[in-house]
C-alpha cells in the first residue's frame, strides 16, 4: 500500500480550505483517509497552516510520501528539516 500525505479539499465553492491527511494513493482526493494531521486555509490573510509536526515526521519516516504542495507546506513549518535531522543526524 503506497501511502501519501496530501490535501483533502473542504469548504464551499470558491472558498476552499484543506485538511492535510495521510491516505492510500489509490483512494480519491476527497475520499477515505488513514489519519488527519493538520489543515491549510489559503483564503485567510495571511494563509493559515497548522500541522502536527510529530505525526508528520513519524509518517514520513515510515515511508509516506508528501505531494509537492504538501512538501512545500511542511518545509515552511520546519517539518522537513526535522525529518532530515532525525534521519541523518546533525
UniProtKB/Swiss-Prot annotation:
GO MF annotation: an example: structural constituent of ribosome
Gene3D superfamilies: 3.30.1320.10
NCBIfam families in the record: S16
Family: Belongs to the bacterial ribosomal protein bS16 family.
Membrane-spanning residues: none
Organism: Brevibacillus brevis (strain 47 / JCM 6285 / NBRC 100599)
GO biological-process terms attached to the record: translation
InterPro entries according to UniProt: Ribosomal_bS16, Ribosomal_bS16_dom_sf
Pfam families recorded: Ribosomal_S16
Domain of life: Bacteria
Stated name of the protein: Small ribosomal subunit protein bS16
UniProt-listed HAMAP family: Ribosomal_bS16
GO CC term, one of those recorded: small ribosomal subunit
Gene symbol of the encoding locus: rpsP
Keyword vocabulary terms for this entry: Ribonucleoprotein, Ribosomal protein
